[in-house]
């Protein structure tokens, strides 16, 4: 069976990572969370004084980005990969609201996207990968054999994020999360470099009212169709 590249793009908190991880595990592919890479750069920026309030010291980050290396290693307890920033596990740190509120302006910077896209393309050279993000099917792997674009209503996505934070024992109000979701949608769709959009050849999946099992079944079906071609 031929190996392919699978690109899953879509809005924040619409379950891209969960479905990408599950699909990768099911078909024996490597999963790469591109969103986690931008979150890791954001965390680095927060921890290294690159933010002054909401203002980014772009010159300082431009100098630092050359030495920022993001990798993924399997976590035997979860069965899924954790994110490492320069060799340090930051999986839990990058999922906080503090990082969520600052990740969109960081990921909108052209030199940050250029650096991350280069790392992502290096990871996917041999195919056999599932990568999710905002511009995987349009910019990172425009020739991916299977492209999915995922969407859901802002309210449903905010509720999912709220439930996820609550399960991890982290605080956050639903209203604050909903506002963050809407802000990120706007920034992601209107940035100058690689804005969020559905690739012309991507399949659309609105999972507002789908269970995880229904999603899995649909994704498996699409994967099967492509690898048999």
Swiss-Prot record:
InterPro entries: Cytidylate_kin, Cytidylate_kinase_dom, P-loop_NTPase
An annotated GO cellular component: cytosol
Annotated residues for binding of ATP: 10-18
PANTHER family, per the entry: CYTIDYLATE KINASE, CYTIDYLATE KINASE/PANTOATE-BETA-ALANINE LIGASE
Keyword line: ATP-binding, Cytoplasm, Kinase, Nucleotide-binding, Transferase
Designated name of the protein: Cytidylate kinase
Catalysed reactions listed for this entry: CMP + ATP = CDP + ADP; dCMP + ATP = dCDP + ADP
Gene: cmk
Similarity comment text for this entry: Belongs to the cytidylate kinase family. Type 1 subfamily.
Listed GO biological process terms: nucleobase-containing small molecule interconversion; pyrimidine nucleotide metabolic process
Pfam short name (any one): Cytidylate_kin
Enzyme Commission number, as recorded: 2.7.4.25
Superkingdom of origin: Bacteria
């Amino acid at each position: 069976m031929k190996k392919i590249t699978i690109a899953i793009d879509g809005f924040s908190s619409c379950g891209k990572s969960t479905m990408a991880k599950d699909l990768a595990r099911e078909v024996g592919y490597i999963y790469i969370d591109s969103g986690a890479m931008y979150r890791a750069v954001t965390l680095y920026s927060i921890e290294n004084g690159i933010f002054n309030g909401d203002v980014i010291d772009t010159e300082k980050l431009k100098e630092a980005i050359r030495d920022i290396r993001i990798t993924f290693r399997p976590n035997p307890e979860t069965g899924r990969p954790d994110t490492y920033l320069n060799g340090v596990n930051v999986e839990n740190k990058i999922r906080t609201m503090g990082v969520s509120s600052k990740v969109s302006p960081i990921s909108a910077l052209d030199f940050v996207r250029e650096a991350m896209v280069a790392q992502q393309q290096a990871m996917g050279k041999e195919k056999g990968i599932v990568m999710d993000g905002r511009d995987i099917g349009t910019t990172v792997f425009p020739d991916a054999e299977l492209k999915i674009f995922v969407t859901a209503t802002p309210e449903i996505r905010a509720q999912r994020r709220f439930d996820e934070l609550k399960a991890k024992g982290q605080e956050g109000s639903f209203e604050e999360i909903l506002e963050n979701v809407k802000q990120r949608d706007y920034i992601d769709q209107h940035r100058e470099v690689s804005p969020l959009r559905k690739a012309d050849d991507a399949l659309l999946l609105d999972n507002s009212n789908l269970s995880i099992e229904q999603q899995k079944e649909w994704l498996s079906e699409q994967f099967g169709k492509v690898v048999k071609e």
